[in-house]
Regions:
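Accessory nucleic acid-recognition modules appended to NTPase machines
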Residues: 2-154
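A cross-kingdom feature that marks ATP-driven nucleic-acid transaction machinery
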Residues: 81-237
């Protein structure tokens, strides 16, 4: 009960709208595209001022029309959307799982707490932290600035990690799943890169649960394909 009271006090100054928005961002795509309502823009600024969230800028750029050319209506109307990141994983965990049920949790017995914790869909929650750790790993492994690593998204596709240094480009996909990753993921990554018009020097795949034999054999033959599992992260621990 004491710890729940402490949590309530920690976020007591947040408005109802700010709490609602934080809960939405905690388990959503984190896109800020829908923040047209002045109330939610105010709530977003409140979360930002409180140091709870920060912005990841989109790498998407709008096409420049040629002289005399008129872009299609859907392209003209398309709004490039940034994304929100919680400044700490704890904040995201709190708003994803604790805040929506904080009043009930304060009355939980020990057994209720165990059942509540076992019911949480943590695999979905851990996808983003794992993706960020993979980006840190690549910064260390490749000797590039962390600021040169980001994710890419537009209205049609999303690439988990994109490294754009002065000497090379790398595109990567990250899977925090309980099953091995197959060549299908690589094919999808290659197709995404072709769609947005980039030609990476390297492709990287990260998997919590390993890779298919086909992918492993392919990586042995191609220096352009890099495969990373949990054991590879020992270097940065």
């Amino acid at each position: 009960m004491g710890k729940i009271t402490e949590l309530k006090a920690l976020f007591a100054n947040l408005s109802k709208d700010a709490n609602k928005l934080a809960q939405r961002l905690a388990l959503s795509s984190r896109s800020l595209k829908g923040l047209k309502d002045p109330r939610f823009r105010k709530a977003f600024n409140e979360l930002k001022s409180a140091g709870l969230i920060k912005i990841e800028k989109s790498l998407e750029t709008k096409p420049t029309p040629l002289f005399g050319e008129k872009l299609r209506r859907e392209i003209r109307r398309h709004l490039i959307s940034d994304k929100a990141h919680f400044s700490k994983n704890f904040y995201r965990f709190y708003f994803a799982f604790i805040a929506p049920k904080i009043e009930q949790i304060s009355e939980f017995s020990d057994k209720d707490k165990e059942q509540f914790l076992s019911s949480l869909k943590l695999e979905r929650f851990f996808c983003l932290p794992f993706e960020l750790v993979c980006a840190d790993f690549l910064s260390h492994k490749l000797g590039v600035l962390r600021s040169s690593i980001s994710s890419y998204w537009d209205k049609d596709c999303e690439i988990d990690i994109l490294v754009q240094s002065s000497s090379f480009c790398l595109a990567a996909e990250v899977k925090y799943k309980e099953h091995i990753v197959s060549k299908k993921l690589l094919n999808e990554l290659v197709a995404k890169c072709e769609k947005i018009g980039i030609k990476p020097d390297f492709y990287a795949l990260f998997s919590k649960s390993g890779f298919s034999g086909e992918l492993i054999n392919l990586a042995k033959k191609s220096p352009k394909l890099l495969l990373f599992e949990l054991n590879d992260f020992k270097d940065i621990l």
